[in-house]
């Protein structure tokens, strides 16, 4: 069985594992105050071209989203998100568990626009019952989106300008950030992303680490006391050095970018396999996620040998599914998928 369900199905990149093993018996202080975390922070600041940034390491995406959002919002406030956004669809009410509403906007290709944010905020502020309605007080997006699509530089700039106009912090979920910035046609680099938001994170769990996300706080107003809420939300690991070591390895010799590009290149082959066989796609994704629409009977047959993620029902006999490439995807796996898809069409 070969699994393309997601990009976190293996352990960690061998370079990360080697560094963890090399440092295993070195004693350090706890809770991310060690020299490995310090080195990783400096490397991330350099990559972001943001020496003023605060960098914090957390374990996983849901924990990171919950901690960041809870640190920004007051009790009566909510976060604007695409209706397809991860915090709305795939986090089991984690944001709501902090007492904050996820306010959804209809997405197009997984994205929301500056105009949508402006329209909603204006409606809220001008409604006669405004004080009875959850106050939209920050904006959440992911890059790439849930379907693997990307914001253009113009789209993100407009969104950030609107957020600043209304005083709404913009938070970018970067769980798959590497796969986004290394994609064909990507208009945004990590330094540009850092300049066009208030806080974002660089995903490790899905991009070569065993676990871990690196939160980068750009807005000075959001920096104060963040480590307190990290602790309260279970985000400060006693063995925090394990996070620093991994990110230090990932940002040595451009490893993070090299393995992200590898995943995208594997994904382009996967896309071509399905397109050349006549299958349409749910999304025009330039990243590591590809989503063909297939007849259910063919999906069942393919599922005997390959894992994929069910996405949505398209009609009575067709479904959209997701095939993910990752830093660990091999050419042999892709070739096996190609042969199986071609066999379906014979």
Where in the sequence are the language-model features?
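Conserved N-terminal alpha-helix of the aminotransferase class I/II PLP-enzyme fold
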Residues: 13-61, 83-88, 94
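Conserved PLP-anchoring active-site segment centered on the Schiff-base-forming lysine
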Residues: 71-89
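Conserved C-terminal alpha-helix-loop-beta "cap" of PLP-dependent enzymes
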Residues: 74-76, 268-343
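Hydrophobic beta-strand scaffold residues
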Residues: 79, 102-103, 170-172, 281, ...
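PLP-dependent aminotransferase-class I/II
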Residues: 99-137, 141-144, 150-158
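Active-site C-terminal subdomain of aminotransferase-like
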Residues: 108-109, 135-136, 142, 150, ...
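Catalytic PLP-binding core of fold-type I/II PLP enzymes
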Residues: 151-183
